[in-house]
Amino acid sequence: MFASSVRVAGGQDQSWMFGPFEKPAPVNPVIAPRSTSTFRSPMNDSTVLWEEYATFNPGAVVRGGKVYLLYRAEDASGDKEIGHHTSRLGLAESSDGLHFTRRQTPVLYPDRDRQASYEWPGGVEDPRIVESDDGTYILTYTQWNRDVPRLAVATSRDLVSWQKHGPAFAKADSGRYMRLETKSGAIVCRVNGNRLVAARINGKYWMYFNVPEILVATSDNLVDWTPLADAESRLVKVLTPRPGYFDSWLVEAGAPAILTESGIVLFYNAGNSGRYGQEGLPARMYTGGQALFDARNPIKLLARSTTPFIRPTEEYEKTGQYKEGTTFVEGLVPFDGRWFLYYGMADSRVGVAVWDPHGSAVKSPR
């Protein structure tokens, strides 16, 4: 498909899966740190180089014939430990899905607003984007105050101006989940042209979330969410690590989940254990997996990949903040007849992998 590309190891090992994806080597990474972007932080009234240290973990959406990425950017404040910098969300656009132009300032960031105590000093992290039926963009992201990570929701009509709605589970069960560590919200969507539109199943919207096990939540309005719990108030785990496999250490919800003819395909990030993981795969390496859930019962697991469909193979995926290597999947869009997967490289850069489904045996999204 590309003059110079890398076929992703693992690929597609079951017919319901998306892939195989190829990494177009000449363009990767598509976004890297930049030391010329300045921003006046409203939190301490200082000018910061807001994307100087790292740019990674993007959400993606197609709007007006272009691909837009919301990506996590870190400044160089704090020490050199992961999670010890301040994160803000930048916006980039592309007419081909491969070459991006960035805005000079972030579009979502810690501000002197009602969310400040949840978002400062760690910032806003790891965006995922879907649309509602009326075209409103629904953003899930992590609020990080360096105490408790909280999954939060924001909405926008134009991807630039965002309304923060606060922690996703603030109203659930009289606030009992406000101290629960939550992150990584992947909302179930249907494909409508180049749009991924949040889908109702049994009258509710559904979202897979969290790490090291994947949980599930429902909503009536895409803003206020309630985690699914059993009769004893234990949160329902729908995907857990597997000894002996690439996902033996942890599993974490990835890009938005997609309704297909086969069921709901959930893309997830997976960590390998050094003691009881997959042989030949480095300890603590992050790869990508896919899981299939019943379209009428989103907590019923039908199948899951036995090997990673994407994994670190290139030097730029194994050098940076996370030296064990990551291909952290968060953004996926249908565009120009293909599927573009956007992912974080070693917590430092943004990469892309592309799948052309023409002629593939995989069942089509619906």
List where the protein language model places each region.
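Beta-rich carbohydrate-recognition and catalytic domains
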Residues: 2-122, 130-249, 258-322, 336-366
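Short glycine-rich, acidic/polar surface loops and turns
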Residues: 317-319, 327-330
